[in-house]
Structures are given as structure tokens and as C-alpha cells.
């Protein structure tokens, strides 16, 4: 009898050990699942996402790509975007801008982009609102080229020019005086090959990408002041040292920085892609991106100084998504991740199964005694 009890006890311990090993794998989720969960964890009560004005558009683009507008989660309420209600919210936000005459071009583009992904602006925007937007954009046009951030400003900058051009494009309108705008963009060129926010400012990765993007959209990147030098400007931020763990494959945000960022890598990669995509290091950069996924929350993030963990954000996750898309590598997000942390769900499952096993053993022993 004692041998039987000993065997049953041993079997029970082996079963528990097996459950502890198998349960994490059984509950493992793909990189994509982790990412979508992270986005919904950052959904606000009004239906928006994240904390920055661009976060909602970024989240909806990812959700739309994976058709994840409704996601069922074990032991939790369904996570979803109420499309009709959210479309109404977005239209109201845009309408309010014009009602109070306080138009923010940066927010406007992201509202329009989000709305357009859920329903074409041709049917959702309405002719009156469309015409108000078009008229306001025309009022930001500068005689010397470029666009100002408001219709009362008389100074163009690269950022507002980029946003105005994209608003024209998303509402289906053409940009007038393209030659004048291209001439103004060229005036922002600097000797390092980059482009500043206006003719008097130093180059930055973002404004240089905007300049290249606009030239590609308005004409041809070959018309840049010096295409080769601009290409070298982007490439100069690349970390090609395999011993530089954590940065190998990424791009620095500036020459004084120590850590590569998802945002700077995105702008450099997209700029290089427009000039000469053969100069990209796809495999290395994709691996670098994947190493930036944080499985504590499922999102992507950059290193935070003084903290061993990455700080995930909706914006950083979007840059990671777009980088993988650029290299046709989004399928890697279907990869199962088995390094799932032990959590309460696993504990409940293991304890429940253990309880059933203990109950069976108890009944078996009791019946044997009878």
C-alpha cells in the first residue's frame, strides 16, 4: 500500500512539474498578439489611444492592418474600437477646430488619417468641412514657397509644409505652385547634405526626411541639391559595429547620441529607401527592431537611461511596425513567443488542474481503504 501511495505522490509531482513547463507554452502569444494587446491597454475612455496627438492614428493604422478592431481575450471583456461612435468623435473634433477657429495642422492630419482608414473621406467628411479644410490650407501658402503652420503666420517651415502637403493629398486636392515649393525646400539645404526646418536652421534627420519625401512626391529625388550627399547624411547615423550590442543595426538620432532610437531609425530608413534602397541593411535592422519588443507589456520601446527595461510607447511601436513593413518582414510578428512570464492565469490553471488530480487521488485512496 505504501508503495502505491509513493507512486501516486511521485506521479502527482511529475504532473505538476509537467504543467509548470507546458502551461507557459500553451498560453504563449505571437508578437502580433502582444502588440495588439499593448495598443488596447493604451486605449483611453474616449476611444483614442496613447498620450500624444499622433498616437491614435498610429494605433488605428496597426489595428486596421491586422483587422483587429475587435479582439476577444480569455477571462476579459472583448477589446474593440466602436467604429461608428469613433468616426463621429473624429468628425466632431475636426468640426470643433473650425467652429472655434483654432486649427492645428498636425492634429488635423492625424484625425483625417484615422477617419480615412475607417471610412473614405469622400463619404465621411462632408463637402462643407472639406471646403473649409481646403480653404484653410490655401491660406497657409507662402508666396516665397512652403507653407506656414497657421493662416496668420508669414513664415514657412519644413514640418508644416510636410503636413499641409499630406492633408492636401488625403482630401484629394492638388498642391499649386509646386515649382515655388520645391525651390523653397532646396533653400533649406545645408553643407552636410541634410535639410533644416527653414533656410537658416541646421539639419535634422526628421526635416531632411521631410525634404526628401516632398521632393519624391512633388517631382524627383534626383532634383535634390546633392542626392549622394543627402544619402551619406542618413547613413552616417547607422551603427555597423556588431560589438555594440543593442545598437547594431539601428540609427542614432544625432551625432552626440549614444543610443539608437526607433524614431530616428524609421526616418533614416525611409529617407534612404527613397534615394537608394540598396544602401539599406535589412536583415540587421529587422533583428534590431525585434529586440526592441518589450514582453512585459507587449509594445516596442527604446532604452530608458538608468533603466534596464525599455519604455514602450504607441509611437515607438508604430515606428517598429513601419520598419518591419518597409523590409517586407511583418510576417515575423506571427512568431510564437514562449518566453511568457508566469502570471495569475497560469497559476489559476495549474492550481485548478492540481486540485482535480488531488481530488482523484484522494477518492482513489479512500475507495481502496474501504
Predicted regions and their residues:
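Intrinsic disorder/low-complexity segments enriched in polar/small residues
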Residues: 3-8, 44, 120, 174
Amino acid at each position: 500500500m505504501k508503495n502505491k501511495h509513493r507512486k501516486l505522490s511521485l506521479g502527482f509531482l511529475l504532473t505538476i512539474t509537467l504543467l509548470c513547463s507546458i502551461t507557459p507554452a500553451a498560453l504563449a502569444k505571437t508578437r502580433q498578439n502582444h502588440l495588439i494587446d499593448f495598443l488596447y491597454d493604451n486605449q483611453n475612455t474616449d476611444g483614442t489611444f496613447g498620450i500624444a496627438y499622433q498616437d491614435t492614428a498610429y494605433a488605428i493604422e496597426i489595428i486596421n492592418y491586422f483587422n483587429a478592431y475587435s479582439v476577444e481575450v480569455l477571462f476579459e471583456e472583448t477589446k474593440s474600437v466602436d467604429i461608428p461612435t469613433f468616426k463621429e468623435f473624429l468628425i466632431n473634433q475636426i468640426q470643433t477646430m473650425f467652429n472655434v477657429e483654432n486649427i492645428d495642422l498636425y492634429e488635423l492630419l492625424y484625425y483625417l488619417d484615422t477617419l480615412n482608414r475607417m471610412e473614405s473621406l469622400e463619404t465621411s467628411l462632408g463637402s462643407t468641412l472639406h471646403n473649409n479644410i481646403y480653404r484653410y490650407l490655401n491660406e497657409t501658402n507662402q508666396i516665397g514657397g512652403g507653407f506656414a503652420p497657421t493662416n496668420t503666420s508669414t513664415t514657412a517651415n519644413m514640418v508644416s509644409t510636410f503636413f499641409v502637403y499630406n492633408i492636401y493629398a488625403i482630401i484629394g486636392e492638388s498642391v499649386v505652385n509646386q515649382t515655388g515649393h520645391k525651390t523653397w525646400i532646396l533653400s533649406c539645404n545645408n553643407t552636410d547634405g541634410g535639410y533644416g526646418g527653414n533656410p537658416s536652421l541646421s539639419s535634422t534627420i526628421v526635416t531632411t526626411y521631410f525634404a526628401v519625401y516632398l521632393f519624391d512626391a512633388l517631382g524627383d529625388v534626383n532634383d535634390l541639391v546633392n542626392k549622394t550627399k543627402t544619402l551619406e547624411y542618413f547613413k552616417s547615423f547607422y551603427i555597423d559595429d556588431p560589438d555594440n550590442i543593442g545598437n547594431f543595426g539601428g540609427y542614432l538620432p544625432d551625432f552626440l547620441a549614444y543610443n539608437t532610437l526607433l524614431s530616428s531609425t524609421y526616418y533614416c530608413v525611409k529617407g534612404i529607401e527613397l534615394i537608394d534602397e540598396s544602401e539599406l541593411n535589412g536583415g540587421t535592422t529587422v533583428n534590431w527592431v525585434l529586440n526592441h519588443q518589450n514582453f512585459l507589456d507587449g509594445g516596442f520601446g527604446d532604452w530608458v537611461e538608468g533603466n534596464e527595461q525599455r519604455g514602450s510607447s504607441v509611437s515607438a511601436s508604430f515606428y517598429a511596425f513601419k520598419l518591419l513593413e518597409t523590409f517586407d518582414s511583418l510576417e515575423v510578428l506571427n512568431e510564437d513567443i514562449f518566453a511568457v512570464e508566469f502570471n495569475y492565469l497560469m497559476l489559476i490553471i495549474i492550481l485548478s488542474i492540481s486540485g482535480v488530480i488531488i481530488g482523484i487521488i484522494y477518492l482513489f485512496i479512500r475507495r481502496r481503504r474501504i
